[in-house]
C-alpha cells in the first residue's frame, strides 16, 4: 500500500454532489484526479459543479484564480472504469445501496493496481460487507466526507473488520492532506456521525408530528438552546430527506425499532419533497 506521500493519482467513483466535492478538494490539494461516472452527462454535470464551486471560492478571496484553474485542469472526467488503472487511492461515492457498492468494489478490485487503497464514502453501510466483494479487504477503509465537502472540515475514518492498520493511517493522512480534521470510528451502523445525527433529525420530525412545536420553533429552539448552526429541519433539507430516510432505515434494520423513521419523514420522501435539491422539503426554496 502507498504512503500518503506516494499518492499521485486519486480516483473518485461518482460525480454527484459528494463525488464532485471530493474530486475538487483532492485536485485543489495537488493530486491528479480521475472522476468517473456511468454517463457522460453525469460527468459533465460534476465538472460544472466543481467549476462553479471554485468560482465561488475565488469570488470570496478564499482561492486565487490561478490555483482554481490549475485544480480544474487536474481533474479528468470519464465513463471508463479502466481509467482508474493508475490510481493509488480511490474513493467511491455512489448511491447508498449495498449491492451497487459491492459491484463497484468488485470492479475496482479488478482494474486498480494491487497497491491501491479502496475507500468508500458511505455514511451508514458496513465497510466490512463492502470489502468482502474484493480480494483485498485489508486495503478497504471508510473515508466519510461531510457535505458540502469543500466547506466542511471533518472527515470520518471508518475501520472495517479486516482493514489493515497501515491503511487506516493512510486514510487519516490523506484526509489531513486535504486540510481536513479526522476522527475514527469502528464499523458499527451509522459510525459516529450518523449514529447520533440521524436519530436527532428523526426525533425532531417526530416532535413536529406529535404537535410538540412548529418546525420553526423546533429549529429555533435547537439553535438557540444548544448552539448548533442548523436545526433538524434545516439540516434535513440540506442533507436531503431521502438520504436521511435511507440512513435511518439502515439504523432501524441493524439496531431495532427505536430507530424507526418518523411517519412524516417517509411521507415527505414519498411525495418527492426531498429538500433543497427539489425546491421543497420541510421548507420552500427558490
Language-model features: locations:
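Structural/interface elements that position substrates and couple domains in central-metabolism enzymes
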Residues: 34, 51, 66, 194-202, ...
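Hydrophobic/aromatic beta-strand patches that form the interior of the parallel beta-sheet core
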Residues: 34, 76, 91, 141-143, ...
Amino acid at each position: 500500500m502507498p504512503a500518503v506521500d506516494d499518492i499521485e493519482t486519486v480516483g473518485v467513483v461518482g460525480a454527484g454532489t459528494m463525488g464532485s466535492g471530493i474530486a475538487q478538494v483532492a485536485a485543489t490539494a495537488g493530486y491528479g484526479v480521475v472522476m468517473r461516472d456511468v454517463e457522460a452527462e453525469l460527468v459533465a454535470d460534476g465538472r460544472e459543479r466543481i467549476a462553479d464551486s471554485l468560482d465561488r471560492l475565488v469570488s470570496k478571496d478564499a482561492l486565487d484564480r490561478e490555483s482554481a484553474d490549475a485544480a480544474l485542469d487536474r481533474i479528468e472526467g470519464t465513463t471508463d472504469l479502466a481509467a482508474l488503472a493508475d490510481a493509488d487511492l480511490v474513493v467511491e461515492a455512489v448511491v447508498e445501496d449495498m449491492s451497487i457498492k459491492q459491484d463497484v468494489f468488485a470492479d475496482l478490485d479488478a482494474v486498480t493496481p494491487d497497491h491501491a487503497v479502496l475507500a468508500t464514502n458511505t455514511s451508514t453501510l458496513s465497510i466490512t460487507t463492502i470489502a468482502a466483494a474484493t480480494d483485498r479487504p485489508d486495503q478497504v477503509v471508510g473515508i466519510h466526507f461531510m457535505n458540502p465537502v469543500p466547506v466542511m472540515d471533518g472527515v470520518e475514518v471508518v475501520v472495517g473488520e479486516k482493514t489493515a492498520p497501515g491503511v487506516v493511517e493512510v486514510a487519516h493522512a490523506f484526509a489531513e492532506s486535504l486540510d481536513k480534521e479526522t476522527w475514527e470510528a469502528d464499523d458499527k451502523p451509522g459510525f459516529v456521525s450518523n449514529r447520533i445525527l440521524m436519530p436527532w433529525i428523526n426525533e425532531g420530525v417526530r416532535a413536529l408530528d406529535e404537535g410538540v412545536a412548529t418546525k420553526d420553533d423546533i429549529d429555533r429552539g435547537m439553535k438557540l438552546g444548544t448552539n448548533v448552526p442548523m436545526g433538524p429541519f434545516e439540516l434535513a433539507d440540506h442533507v436531503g430527506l431521502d438520504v436521511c430516510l435511507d440512513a435511518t432505515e439502515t439504523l432501524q434494520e441493524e439496531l431495532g425499532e427505536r430507530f424507526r423513521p418518523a411517519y412524516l419523514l417517509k411521507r415527505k420522501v414519498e411525495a418527492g419533497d426531498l429538500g433543497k435539491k427539489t425546491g421543497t422539503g420541510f421548507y420552500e426554496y427558490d
